[in-house]
Structures are given as C-alpha cells and as structure tokens.
C-alpha cells in the first residue's frame, strides 16, 4: 500500500471516531436554580446535556447565572431526584444517577431519606425518577 493511500485510510478512520462517539451511551445532566427551578436533559456529552438543562432552567424563570450544574452521569442509568428539608429550614435536592434499575434507584432514595441516619431532616421525599432515556416515571 502506498504512503498516500495509507494516509487517506488513516485520515478516514480518524474522522469516523467523533461520529462514533456520538452514538455511544447518552448521559443525563441535572441543573438546579435554588428557589427557582431546574432542568434535566440527555446528551452525548456533558456540554450538550448541561446546555439543554440550563436552557430548561432559564425557561422555568431562573436567571442563567443561577442555574447550577449539579450532576452528570454517563451512561445515564436510572436516576432519582430527592427533596430534603433540614429541621432549621434550609431545603435542597439530592440527585443520584447512573443506577442499574428503578428498584435500586428507589431503594437508594429510601436509604438517603432514612430518618434514623439523618434525624435532622423534617422532610425527605422522592420528587422524580428518570429511566435511562430520561423519561419521567412519576406523575407531576
């Protein structure tokens, strides 16, 4: 094989890798703007997922700079979004993603909300469960 043909074949092979990477497992991005809203999006890359999730966050009424990138998992797996509130008032969301099944996601949430382990919580509940394609599993 001539050097010229080798270079053409090598160039074609290298050019195919970025396209192949986009066909890999999707990830899931979570963004939260405290007291305002949030966003959840699937993406081939963290940049793609977070860009979409920030857009959703802004559409919910938050300012762009208030939309905090909180979680990225690739592959996405099953995800669970948990609301927690401290007895002194502060409240927040905890997200666990990349889990192998819905049952494990719900079990993880149950452990996170175990009041015998976190007796300072006055409220802790699952807000949403997402399947590996980013589809919501709970009615809103």
Could you describe each region identified by the protein language model?
Residues 16-18:
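N-terminal signal peptide c-region/cleavage motif recognized by signal peptidases
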Residues 22-140:
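Secreted/extracellular ectodomain signature
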Residues 7, 20-23:
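Compositionally biased, low-complexity repeat tracts
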Residues 1-8:
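Bacterial N-terminal signal peptides that target proteins for export
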């Amino acid at each position: 094989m001539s050097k010229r043909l080798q270079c053409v074949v090598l160039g074609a092979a290298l050019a195919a890798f970025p396209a192949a990477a986009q066909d890999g497992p999707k990830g899931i991005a979570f963004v939260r703007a405290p007291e305002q809203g949030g966003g959840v999006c699937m993406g081939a890359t963290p940049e793609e997922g977070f860009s979409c999730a920030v857009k959703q966050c802004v559409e919910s009424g938050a300012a762009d700079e208030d939309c905090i990138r909180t979680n990225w998992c690739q592959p996405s797996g099953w995800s669970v979004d948990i609301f927690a509130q401290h007895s002194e008032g502060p409240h927040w969301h905890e997200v666990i993603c990349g889990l192998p099944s819905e049952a494990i996601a719900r079990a993880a949430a149950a452990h996170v909300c175990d009041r015998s382990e976190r007796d300072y919580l006055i409220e802790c509940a699952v807000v949403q469960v997402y399947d590996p394609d980013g589809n919501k599993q709970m009615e809103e």
